[in-house]
């Protein structure tokens, strides 16, 4: 781990304030692990590089390397092979139904589909590279949403699109759903109209996955 990488073997206690819901497909556990690694590196002044932190992080979870670095990235392999992409100029509204989806079960169901639909990654990357938000939104697709086939997910997608989202998809393995909006003002307006969800937030793309707050 981060301590062992610099010969530090002390036992420590930490407290993590978790703001992301569980079984939402938002990488909450991975974000906690990434924050802990960043904090250890800072506290013990081990000065590990992002590459070193990511090599530790991937052993904890496939999404941890992305949470360590953040930004907009193309993730390949199990998630540890990352390429930088320009962040689109947009905003998101995220809502979560009162149901959770087990990640292992989501992948198991996906694996049972003989010929699942997939997005055209080359086309999507071209629109991301050109900053074409409408092109990005028209080519978004989540194969796990296709596999989940849950009424609650479909309802959340409908509600977001009905509130003005350019596109709406399930996040990761679910069950949260995000809607894409052209700016923060339209996202906030839409969020104010959405009610009855166990979790709701408005956010924007950022260049990094962490921030120290003193």
Question: Where are the language model's segments positioned?
Answer:
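DPxDG-like acidic metal-binding loop motif
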Residues: 24-50, 66
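Conserved, helical-rich catalytic subdomain that frames metal- and/or nucleotide-binding sites
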Residues: 69, 74-167, 182-195, 202-214
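Glycine-rich beta-strand-to-loop/alpha-helix junction loops that act as flexible
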Residues: 28-29, 171-175
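Short hydrophobic/aromatic beta-strand micro-patches
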Residues: 178-180
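Short, well-structured alpha-helical segments that form the helix of a local strand-helix-strand
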Residues: 49-60, 188-191
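Single conserved hydrophobic/aromatic residue that forms the stacking wall/gate
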Residues: 1-12
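Short pre-catalytic strand/loop immediately N-terminal to key active-site residues, enriched for Gly-Thr
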Residues: 14-25, 166-168
């Amino acid at each position: 781990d981060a301590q062992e990488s610099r010969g530090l073997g002390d036992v420590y206690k930490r407290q993590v304030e978790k703001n992301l819901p569980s079984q939402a497909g938002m990488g909450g556990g991975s974000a906690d692990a990434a924050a802990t690694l960043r904090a250890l590196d800072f506290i013990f002044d081990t000065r590990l590089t992002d590459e070193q932190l990511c090599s530790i992080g991937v052993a904890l979870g496939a999404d941890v390397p992305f949470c360590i670095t953040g930004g907009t990235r193309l993730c390949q392999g199990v998630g540890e092979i990352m390429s930088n992409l320009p962040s689109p100029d947009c905003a998101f509204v995220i809502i979560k139904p009162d149901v959770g989806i087990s990640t292992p079960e989501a992948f198991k169901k996906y694996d049972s589909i003989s010929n699942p639909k997939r997005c055209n990654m080359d086309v999507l990357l071209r629109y991301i590279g050109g900053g074409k938000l409408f092109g990005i939104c028209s080519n978004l697709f989540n194969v796990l949403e296709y596999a989940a086939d849950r009424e609650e997910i479909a309802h959340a997608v409908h509600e977001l699109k009905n509130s003005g989202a350019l596109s709406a998809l399930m996040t990761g393995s679910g069950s949260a759903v995000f809607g894409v909006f052209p700016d923060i003002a339209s996202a906030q307006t839409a969020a104010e109209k959405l009610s009855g969800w166990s979790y709701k937030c408005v956010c924007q793309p950022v260049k990094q996955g962490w921030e120290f707050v003193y």
